[in-house]
Amino acid sequence: MLAQLKKEVFEANLALPKHHLVTFTWGNVSAIDREKNLVVIKPSGVDYDVMTENDMVVVDLFTGNIVEGNKKPSSDTPTHLELYRQFPHIGGIVHTHSRHATIWAQAGLDIIEVGTTHGDYFYGTIPCTRQMTTKEIKGNYELETGKVIVETFLSRGIEPDNIPAVLVHSHGPFAWGKDANNAVHNAVVLEEVAYMNLFSQQLNPYLSPMQKDLLDKHYLRKHGQNAYYGQ
């Protein structure tokens, strides 16, 4: 079942340690088949160096029940499922504890747009969610994490297709894309942007967002209706 999607998710998960986004098993990638409403995700707690395509777990988008697989799905599965349910255009999701993006999440700070590297991928500020409540933490924590992410985008009027990443307060980053590989790509860029911004704001604590015209130019030439740019 979903052999090609399993292969894509497996390879995307292997890309996380390759790009230094994870320590031990601190990360996961998933992808969705929208026609079948099925999600393929990394198994829980399996080391990357022994993981195989057959270890990937298939779960139902709406119930979270295992449809295929002999291992437990990632503990973050309910978060992934909530994002797929609420953000209908995304096809792949990545969660990591990559160092610099997690620093921003632990500080509870947004990553503002200050340079063209950011503008090439994110059409504005990368938001950090609010702190979760005691009730949310003690309840269905992973599902509530997804709901807090969705709430952040809705309450701030952010389009998830334009800002394909978020920082969960005191936790870490999630990134997404059109498929698993694209989601990993965005997670790599998020980590790089977090690193750049950390030092930029140390050098200039009064740093303000980049010019709107420059942000428009860099984002729209790559993602707009008349996109033309590629390196």
Curated annotation (Swiss-Prot):
Gene name tied to this protein: sgbE
InterPro entries from the UniProt entry: Aldolase_class_II_sugar_metab (IPR050197), Aldolase_II/adducin_N (IPR001303), Aldolase_II/adducin_N_sf (IPR036409), AraD (IPR004661)
State the reactions this protein catalyses: L-ribulose 5-phosphate = D-xylulose 5-phosphate
Organism equals: Haemophilus influenzae (strain ATCC 51907 / DSM 11121 / KW20 / Rd)
Question: What EC number(s) does this enzyme carry?
Answer: 5.1.3.4
Transmembrane portions of the chain: none
Q: Where is the active site?
A: D120, Y229
One GO biological process term is: pentose catabolic process
| Biological role | Catalyzes the interconversion of L-ribulose 5-phosphate (LRu5P) and D-xylulose 5-phosphate (D-Xu5P) via a retroaldol/aldol mechanism (carbon-carbon bond cleavage analogous to a class II aldolase reaction). May be involved in the utilization of 2,3-diketo-L-gulonate.
Identify the SUPFAM superfamilies for this entry. Answer: AraD/HMP-PK domain-like
Amino-acid positions noted as binding Zn(2+) in the UniProt annotation, renumbered to this chain: D76, H95, H97, H171
Q: Tell whether Nucleotide-binding is among the UniProt keywords.
A: no
Q: What are the UniProt keywords, alphabetically?
A: Carbohydrate metabolism, Isomerase, Metal-binding, Zinc
Q: What is the lineage of its organism?
A: Bacteria, Pseudomonadati, Pseudomonadota, Gammaproteobacteria, Pasteurellales
Provide the protein name.
L-ribulose-5-phosphate 4-epimerase SgbE
> What cofactor is this protein dependent on?
Zn(2+)
The record's cofactor note says: Binds 1 zinc ion per subunit.
Annotated substrate binding sites = G27, N28, S44, G45, S74, S75
